[in-house]
Amino acid sequence: MAVIGIVSITPALPLIANELNISKEKIGILVSVFTLPGIILTPIFGIISDKLGRRFILLPSIFILGFFSILSFFARDFYLLTIFRFLSGIGAASLGAMNITLIGDMFDNVKREKILGYNNSVLNLGTTVFPFLAGILANIHWSLVFALPSLAILIFIWLLTSFKDIAPAPKISEKYFRNFLNLLKNKVLIKIFIVNLLTYIILFGSLWTYLPLLMSQRFNAEPFFIGLTLSSMSFTTSIFSIFFGHLVKKISYIKLFSLSFILYSIVLFLITVVSEWYYLFIATVLFGIGHGLNLPNIQAFIIRLAPDTHRSGIIFLNRTISQVGQTAGPLISAGILFLFPNTNVSINAVFYFSVILGILLAVFSQFISTKNN
């Protein structure tokens, strides 16, 4: 549920743009407006979760996501669809952080890194299957892609009777907020937040939002093949996430960061030069390897730096930063498209920008200490 609201619609973005007569600069709004509510609400949900428990936030969130996704299915006007996407994004705001919080609640330090790898594997299994299914559904009708996040209603009904809070909710006091603010002075934590922000600007500014547009315009690819290509990246990510717990025993966290971002840059450049759409499989598989090393690495740092009493708040703040990247990425790319009216040049410029960010991240990650300071 944490990823379905985005990855289930990206294969259909070119088709939605054509059907609703929306320009290539505006179509990314459907992604940005979904992630926008999380920028404000996610840290608030994290604090409430620490005070009132995980169930208090989790159940309403899943219901809201499902309900407004159903309404999105029936929308035939771009602006109405945008409103429903925004409202469903309110429901999705807490979900990406909640699963990490629950892992922190349930497992000790010895098991967390392995479980984080498994969690990312499951997460990316979703981002493998859903774009593929969305591509099939979009070939029937573009609105059917919104049927997938509507499944959240069924999850809500199941959790309503089966989910109970695992961790006791501590009292929120002035001391809690004071200690929380002190945690934000941690230099390592700040650097990880920066890495997380730029990672999602790359991911959503180029791959998830504008790779479908590139495939549609340059190769005339149908939604099914767009979904298949995006799924290949997520499948590889899920495989490598499984082995994260083993890899960190042999390769340092910092080297894994560097390898991830170097792969990002290589892949994003390759995307601009391939001559046939099926060559993109090589690029997306390589990107999936890099992302499978990067994402659990970020999460492992965050959990290790966050004490039990503030874990939810810190994880939710990190999720907020992710959503800033998810929101800003498509908007930055839209700005690049606006600056370069020629379609081929503008699409390439979007990916060149991400190549530069990847190189900068590879250098920046070398200044991250593995010590808590």
Residue spans of the language-model regions?
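Helix-to-loop junctions at the C-terminal end of transmembrane segments
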Residues: 42-53, 240-252, 337
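Helix-loop-helix hairpin linking two adjacent transmembrane segments in secondary transporters
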Residues: 118-161
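Juxtamembrane intracellular "pre-TM" segments in multi-pass secondary transporters
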Residues: 164-193
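Cytoplasmic helix-loop-helix junction between adjacent transmembrane helices
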Residues: 78, 84-123
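C-terminal membrane-cytosol helix-exit motif in multi-pass small-molecule transporters
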Residues: 150-169, 361-369
